[in-house]
Amino acid sequence: MLFDTHAHLNAVQYEEDLEQVIERARAEGVSHIVVVGFDRPTIDRAIEL
């Protein structure tokens, strides 16, 4: 069981392939990902995720 303790999956770079990124992480044994916001919009997006 692995935890990614600092990820920016809320960044625009992941808009098109977010699900694939998460699935690849799961396939490698990552069970939890902490998404970090760096401004108000990314904080809101982190909460959504």
Swiss-Prot record:
One of its GO terms (molecular function) is hydrolase activity, acting on ester bonds. This is Uncharacterized metal-dependent hydrolase in metS 3'region. Its EC number is 3.1.-.-. Coiled coil: none annotated. GO terms for cellular component: cytosol. The keyword Transmembrane does not apply. InterPro entries: DNase_TatD-rel_CS, Metal_Hydrolase, TatD-like. Its cofactor is a divalent metal cation. Binds 2 divalent metal cations per subunit. It comes from the Bacteria. Belongs to the metallo-dependent hydrolases superfamily. TatD-type hydrolase family. Keywords: Hydrolase. The keyword tRNA-binding does not apply. Pfam families: TatD_DNase (PF01026).
